């Protein structure tokens, strides 16, 4: 069967930069799914996109569907003939198949013999299927917001102007979004505005590049990266390439040209983060640092044209950025006229959540939690309390209202200016750490206390009003808050009891609609986040389940047990001991054992049970100090030595002895074995 490349390109006015790549990938996936559903084979599908086009190229596309062998079943043979003559049922079936009764066959099945007909159905030509496939793919695109244009009732993200559909060298006759398919595309709006007729689908990328368009998203992104780095090198600086900004800029240009501009050094008196946010958010500029990591009065802009006069483009950008940076300087100067502490009253008019009060209420709650945590971790409770009082004050400053991503950062700057203790100032920024899984945790005790308190307050409050996350909905980012708490406690090695902290946090809220069982619900939710954490660490979920089966409420202790059980699970003895513990659990459960672990050595009869009893006693003496010191890995190493005695016991000893006293004693021996392992985890869970 012959195979040929397919090209589909939809030309439009400038699309939203954030939507370009998702739309192109969705178009690719929609066409690929349509082809697969139609049983048309192809080798691969690739997505391309620029601000003015979405395109898909399918390689090795078969020219038709495969032929299919069809089998139709008619009436039962007994009903198909009477006295050797075909009945109306047989004749009607033959007519429906377009043949005579003589052309029909007998089909043998488990339910008897039937009249049937077999024939081969030719596959439909791919070009006949493509219009509907492409139309469905386009209609299914996740367009953020549709619009209409002109007198047409057609809707799309932006007005569309051309449609290319080429199967090899041939145009596929089709109409999509009111556009008739052809072979004519467009190049760069300014460098190559004339129409471009494509002779073949394979010509697409080269033809566009010759017309100053890089259609490949990844290639365009890397071209920008290379140019930005090269410009930085020329200026003896380091370019900071934010990947999100790189993606956005890539969605704004078809033919990237990086240029370096400058701004007045007087703006460097403004905190660097403010200037960077302004350049990034307003103008999509990349900033440059000197060898010491200090912001330089330079920026890199990515133009969409190769100008004959690059300096004019640079000067235009410098003219545009000047008032933007002046605004940032104005916000900074205005904010500094008022102390952070004086803004606390303004928090009374900012609602945190309708049922949970204002930001002033939240600040009061986290003050109590922060000071408690600080005292528990050896920090300064007064510093933690002061940090909590000021924690949300920068949210009502001009700078943060303009650039919300600077929350905490500006609080630190303003607190330092106000003469607050350095730990207090630093905590205002640290309260938002970690921002993602691999991010740093706070470095100061006040920062640790504040970061924990803020998240615990949010978790208990939102759960307490019955708005816990469900499915994909998590409007208050509770998953991130829970993971943040776990990360802080584990990475900072804070051995705090999460239940105790949650009880304190819940108490600060007073009456909550869902107060009953609140602490247990939040605790379970948070500890369940360890499941994803273990998977990210490459640890089997059975290890998580083994630890989760125990009533462990200290996340640091939980993590230590996870690592210890993971190491144990790699040992040769682990499989046998996990199986043995599962067997023990089943036996004790079935016999409804009372939990007694007291073994009467006088009732030990078999050598194997005596050996196991002695081994358990020795292990208990060796393991107890290790458990008390939370040295779980070493404890499990000791317990691994029980494999031999345990195997011998189950091989040589009948647990369910006829003598009731002996039977109870053996059950107690098994309960003693189980309880020793349960000091760390339920390793029976490893046997899944």
From Swiss-Prot:
InterPro entries for the chain: DALR_anticod-bd, Gly-tRNA-synth_bsu, Gly-tRNA-synth_heterodimer
GO molecular function terms listed in the Swiss-Prot or TrEMBL record: arginine-tRNA ligase activity; ATP binding; glycine-tRNA ligase activity
Matches recorded under Pfam families: DALR_1, tRNA_synt_2f
Its EC number(s): 6.1.1.14
UniProt-annotated location(s): Cytoplasm
GO BP, sorted A to Z: arginyl-tRNA aminoacylation; glycyl-tRNA aminoacylation
Major enzyme class: ligase
Keywords attached to this entry: Aminoacyl-tRNA synthetase, ATP-binding, Cytoplasm, Ligase, Nucleotide-binding, Protein biosynthesis
Gene Ontology CC annotations of this record: cytosol
Reaction equation(s) it catalyzes: tRNA(Gly) + glycine + ATP = glycyl-tRNA(Gly) + AMP + diphosphate
Recorded family membership: Belongs to the class-II aminoacyl-tRNA synthetase family.
Complex formation: Tetramer of two alpha and two beta subunits.
Entry-linked HAMAP family: Gly_tRNA_synth_beta (MF_00255)
Protein name (record): Glycine--tRNA ligase beta subunit
Native organism: Chromohalobacter salexigens (strain ATCC BAA-138 / DSM 3043 / CIP 106854 / NCIMB 13768 / 1H11)
């Amino acid at each position: 069967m012959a195979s040929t490349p397919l090209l589909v390109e939809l030309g439009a006015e400038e699309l939203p930069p954030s939507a370009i790549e998702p739309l192109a990938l969705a178009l690719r996936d929609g066409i690929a799914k349509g082809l697969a559903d139609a049983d048309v084979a192809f080798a691969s599908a690739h997505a391309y996109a620029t601000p003015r086009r979405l395109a898909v190229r399918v390689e090795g596309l078969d020219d038709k569907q495969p032929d299919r062998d069809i089998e139709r079943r008619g009436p039962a043979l007994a009903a198909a003939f009477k006295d050797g003559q075909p009945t109306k049922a047989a004749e009607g079936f033959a007519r429906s198949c377009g043949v005579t009764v003589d052309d029909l066959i007998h089909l043998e099945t488990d339910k008897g013999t039937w009249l049937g007909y077999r024939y081969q159905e030719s596959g439909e030509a791919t070009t006949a299927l493509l219009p509907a496939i492409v139309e469905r793919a386009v209609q299914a695109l996740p367009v953020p917001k549709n619009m209409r244009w002109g007198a047409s009732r057609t809707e799309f993200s932006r007005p569309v102007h051309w449609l290319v559909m080429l199967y090899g060298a041939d145009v596929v006759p089709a109409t999509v979004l009111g556009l008739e398919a052809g072979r004519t595309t467009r190049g760069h709006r300014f460098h190559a505005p004339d129409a471009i007729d494509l002779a073949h689908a394979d010509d697409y990328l080269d033809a566009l590049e010759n017309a100053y368009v890089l259609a490949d998203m990844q290639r365009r992104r890397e071209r920008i990266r290379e140019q930005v780095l090269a410009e930085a090198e020329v200026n003896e600086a380091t370019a900071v390439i934010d990947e999100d900004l790189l993606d956005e800029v890539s969605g704004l240009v078809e033919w990237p040209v990086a240029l370096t501009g400058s701004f007045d050094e007087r703006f460097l008196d403004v905190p660097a983060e403010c200037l960077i946010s302004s350049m990034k958010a307003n103008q999509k500029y990349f900033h440059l640092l000197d060898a010491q990591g200090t912001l330089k009065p330079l920026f890199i802009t990515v133009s969409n044209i190769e100008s004959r006069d690059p300096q004019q483009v640079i000067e235009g950008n410098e003219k545009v950025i000047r008032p933007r940076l002046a605004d940032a300087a104005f916000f900074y100067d205005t904010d500094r006229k008022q102390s952070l502490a004086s803004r606390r009253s303004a928090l009374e008019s900012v609602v945190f959540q309708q049922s949970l009060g204002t930001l002033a209420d939240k600040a009061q709650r986290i003050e109590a939690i922060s000071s408690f945590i600080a005292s528990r971790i050896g920090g300064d409770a007064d510093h933690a309390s002061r940090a909590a009082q000021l924690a949300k004050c920068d949210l009502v400053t001009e700078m943060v209202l303009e650039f919300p991503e600077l929350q905490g950062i500006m609080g630190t700057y303003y607190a330092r200016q106000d003469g607050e203790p350095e730990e207090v100032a630093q905590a205002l920024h640290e309260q938002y750490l970690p921002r993602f899984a691999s991010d740093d945790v706070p470095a100061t005790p006040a920062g640790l206390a504040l970061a924990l308190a803020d998240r615990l307050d949010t978790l208990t409050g939102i759960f307490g009003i019955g708005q816990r996350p469900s499915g994909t909905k998590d409007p208050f980012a509770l998953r991130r808050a829970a993971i943040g708490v776990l990360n802080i406690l584990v990475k900072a090695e804070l051995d705090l009891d999460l239940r105790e902290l949650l009880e304190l946090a819940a108490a600060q809220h007073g009456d909550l609609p869902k107060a009953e069982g609140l602490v247990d619900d939040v605790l379970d939710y948070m500890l369940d986040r360890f499941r994803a954490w273990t998977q990210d660490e490459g640890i089997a979920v059975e290890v998580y389940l083994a630890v989760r089966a125990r009533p462990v409420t200290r996340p640091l202790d939980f993590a230590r047990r996870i690592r210890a059980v993971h190491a144990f699970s790699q040992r040769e003895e682990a499989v046998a001991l996990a199986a043995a513990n599962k067997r023990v659990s089943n036996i004790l459960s079935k016999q409804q054992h009372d939990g007694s672990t007291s073994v009467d050595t006088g009732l030990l009869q078999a050598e194997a049970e005596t050996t196991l009893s002695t081994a358990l006693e020795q292990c208990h003496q060796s393991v107890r100090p290790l458990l008390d010191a939370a040295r779980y890995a070493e404890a499990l190493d000791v317990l691994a030595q029980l494999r031999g005695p345990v195997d011998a016991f189950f091989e040589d000893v009948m647990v369910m002895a006829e003598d009731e006293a002996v039977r109870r004693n053996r059950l107690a021996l098994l309960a003693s074995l189980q309880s020793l392992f349960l000091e760390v985890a339920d390793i029976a869970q490893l046997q899944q």
